[in-house]
Amino acid sequence: MSSPRPLLPNWFRFDRRLADISRLGFFTDFDGTLVGLRRDPGAVRIGQSTRRLLESLRARGVAVGVLSGRHLEDLVSRVGVAGLWYVGDHGFSLQDPQGCRRLLVSAPVRQQMATLGQLLQSRLASLPGIRIEQKLATVAVHYRSAAPAAVRRARAVIQKVLAEHGKLRLLAGKKVWELMPAEPVSKWTALAHIVRAEKLCMPRALFFYLGDDTTDEFVFRGMRRCKTAACSVAVGDRRPTAARYALKGPGEVRILLGHLLASCRRHQTR
């Protein structure tokens, strides 16, 4: 994988391309990309300026979506913009712009993951700084506030649980482990569905995807394989990455949103 190029200094290339684009999509991860990372995930909200930019893009006919590992209802409440695509639980839950929701996980699997969450809670409750988050189809083990010794003990417990329970996979993110069903579902499978639904795989279409974490690499690799015109953007200092472009952080993401909106106004892109 080659090093991604900084996107903002190269924006003029995309501005020229947008003059010939008839369909545009903008999709982004949430934590660490659209908003900064916080020690308390419950304190995160997008700012009013970011919300207005997303609303303005959507009003111009741009397909806009936010994809996250968060529970779908939690994600929707924190972004708070109507008419967007929302993907939660790393692709296991989806809400379309009309507000219709779709779950990509069966009731037995949901029950399995609920039981797993209870098991992890019982085994990790004594470790300070370790927090268990039960989601629809996944279980997250957060260790941002834990000391190194507690992190090592938690990792050992998780490895033992994985050995005891089949048909699970583990994703390591930024100060979090995600345990999920071993099913072919990811942010990329959800985004591929959205791309088809929004006709972004047709000629004269272009879509962007921004992300900062290891889970976003599924999307970046998928974008490299697809034949649709797409711009993959790694946010932050994660290297190596399959993304072709890079932004330094949420501050530059807001600048990009402003550039994109200005280009849409200039070229009347829809």
Regions found by a protein language model. Name each.
Residues 37, 44-135:
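Active-site phosphate-binding/coordination module
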Residues 5-22, 74-79:
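Short amphipathic alpha-helices and their capping/turn segments at secondary-structure boundaries
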Residues 17-39, 66, 191:
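Asp-based phosphoryl-transfer active-site loop
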Residues 130-148, 167-180:
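Charged, glycine-interspersed solvent-exposed loop segments at helix/strand-loop junctions
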Residues 89, 96-114, 118, 173-203:
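Substrate-recognition "cap/lid" segment bordering the active-site pocket of phosphatases
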Residues 70-89, 149-169:
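Substrate-recognition/cap helix-loop segment adjacent to the acidic, metal-dependent catalytic center
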Residues 2-9, 21, 188-270:
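Mg2+-dependent phosphoryl-transfer enzymes with acidic/Ser/Thr/Gly-rich catalytic loops
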